Design a protein with these regions (language model features):
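Cytosolic covalent-transfer regions centered on His/Cys nucleophiles
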Residues: 1-151
Length: 151
């Protein structure tokens, strides 16, 4: 099964704040037909950040939104040209965002499964280095899909 779609991987974005990234993700939730309510998605992304940071280690963040407006569980990836302050666990800036979108109806199951799979992958240096060195959306999607299938 292909979880990561090439059209949902965005390369070399020039955002300077976490809010710009979250607005982009909310906008894309409409463009990519993930949700029917951009503002609800934005609010859920921000509410989750207020609970505790989704900024992990080594420049990665895993923001996520659970909302009734989200049709199917989905993943959107954004690789930034520079670092953005995300209040990450290691205190470093974030330049690689893996956003999860989960329908309310799947909040307990799909949400936790996606989150744990992605978090586990980011603990492997070969994965994080591969993602950072990838030159195209295709390479990122291929690497993540391969690793997700292995787990």
């Amino acid at each position: 099964m292909t979880l990561i779609k090439i059209n949902k991987v965005f390369m070399n974005k020039n955002f300077t704040t976490q809010d710009e990234v979250m607005n982009f993700l909310a906008d894309q939730s409409i463009v990519l037909s993930i949700s029917e309510d951009r503002d609800a998605v934005y609010e859920k992304l921000m509410e989750r950040e207020e609970e505790s940071t989704t900024g992990m280690m080594d420049g990665f963040a895993i923001p996520h939104a659970k909302d009734a407006s989200i049709k199917d569980a989905d993943i959107v990836i954004v690789r930034l040209n520079g670092k953005v302050d995300w209040k990450s666990l290691d205190g470093e800036g974030t330049d690689f965002v893996i956003a999860l979108f989960i329908p309310d109806s799947e909040a307990g199951t799909t949400h936790l499964k996606f989150l744990s799979q992605v978090a586990r992958l980011l603990m492997h240096k070969d994965v994080t280095e591969g993602l950072k060195q990838a030159q195209s959306a295709e390479e990122i999607a291929e690497l993540l899909n391969q690793k997700l299938e292995e787990n």
